C-alpha cells in the first residue's frame, strides 16, 4: 500500500523558534520527526512513499532524497522509496491529492508529516478493509479536546461529523480527536465534485484555489485563498 505524507504546511505556530527548517524536520531524540514516521512505516512493510512538499520542501528532499541513501542522523539506510510532489502555491491540506490522483490507483495511507506515533498500521489497514469505508480515520482522546478538531461517530464507528477546532462544540461530546492518520480509497477524490484542473489556478479574487478535506468526510471544501 502506498503512503502519502503531507509535508507542505508552513508551520506558522512554531515559526518563531524554527523558522529556517520545516516542521517535519524538527529533531526529536536526534532525528527529524519525519524520519521517525518513515522508520515506523518501513518496519511494518510500508516502503512506497509519496511526500507532498511546499514551504522549505527543498530541505526535506535534500535530507531524504529518494529514500535509497543513508540517514545522516543514524548512519543507517532509510530503506524506503520516496517520490515527491512539489506545490508551487499552497493548495490547502488536500489540494495536492488531486494533483497526484493519477498515482493513486488503490487504497492509500494518508499521514500528516509532523506527528510522532506508535501505531500498528497493519491492524489499521485490516480494520479499513473489513469495514469497507471510503475513508478510515484513526482517532484518540487527548488532554485538550476543547481546542481540538473533534470526530463525532455513531456506535458503529461511522463518522457523522467532523468539528473543526474553530467551530462551536456541543456542550456534551466524546473526546475523540483525529490523529492525522487516514486510509482513503482514491475514488473518494472523484466524488467530491471538484475539478482537479481548477486546484491551484487563480480564482475569482485572483488568488489560487485551495482544497480542504477536514470538515466532513466525503464533503470537500474548495475555496479561494483569502
Give, region by region, the residue ranges found by the protein language model.
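Hydrophobic packing residues within well-ordered alpha-helices of enzyme cores
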Residues: 14, 60-64, 192
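Short, well-ordered beta-strand micro-motif
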Residues: 27, 139, 152, 183-185
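Catalytic-core segments of class I nucleotidyltransferases/pyrophosphorylases
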Residues: 108-109, 116, 122-129, 142-145, ...
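N-proximal low-complexity "stem/linker" segments adjacent to membrane-targeting elements
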Residues: 1-18, 25
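Conserved N-terminal catalytic core of the sugar/cofactor nucleotidyltransferase
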Residues: 2-5, 27-123
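A short, conserved acidic/glycine-rich loop-to-beta-strand motif
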Residues: 131-141
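Short acidic-glycine loop/turn motifs at beta-strand connectors
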Residues: 152-158
Amino acid at each position: 500500500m502506498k503512503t502519502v505524507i503531507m509535508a507542505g504546511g508552513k508551520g506558522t505556530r512554531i515559526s518563531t523558534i524554527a523558522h529556517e527548517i520545516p516542521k517535519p524536520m524538527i529533531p526529536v531524540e536526534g532525528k527529524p520527526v519525519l524520519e521517525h514516521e518513515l522508520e515506523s512505516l518501513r518496519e511494518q512493510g510500508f516502503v512506497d512513499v509519496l511526500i507532498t512538499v511546499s514551504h522549505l520542501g527543498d530541505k526535506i528532499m535534500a535530507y531524504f532524497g529518494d529514500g535509497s541513501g543513508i540517514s545522516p542522523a543514524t548512519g543507517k539506510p532509510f530503506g524506503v522509496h520516496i517520490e515527491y510532489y512539489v506545490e508551487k502555491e499552497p493548495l490547502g491540506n488536500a489540494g495536492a491529492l488531486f494533483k497526484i490522483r493519477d498515482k493513486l490507483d488503490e487504497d492509500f495511507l494518508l499521514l500528516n508529516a509532523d506527528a510522532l506515533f506508535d501505531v500498528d498500521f497493519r491492524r489499521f489497514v485490516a480494520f479499513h478493509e473489513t469495514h469497507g469505508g471510503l475513508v478510515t480515520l484513526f482517532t484518540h482522546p487527548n488532554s485538550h479536546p476543547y481546542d481540538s478538531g473533534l470526530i463525532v461517530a455513531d456506535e458503529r464507528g461511522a463518522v457523522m461529523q467532523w468539528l473543526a477546532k474553530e467551530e462551536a462544540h456541543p456542550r456534551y461530546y466524546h473526546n475523540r480527536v483525529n490523529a492525522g492518520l487516514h486510509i482513503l480509497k482514491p475514488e473518494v477524490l472523484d466524488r467530491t465534485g471538484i475539478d482537479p484542473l481548477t486546484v491551484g489556478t487563480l480564482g475569482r479574487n485572483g488568488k489560487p484555489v485551495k482544497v480542504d478535506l477536514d470538515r466532513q468526510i466525503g464533503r470537500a471544501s474548495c475555496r479561494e485563498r483569502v
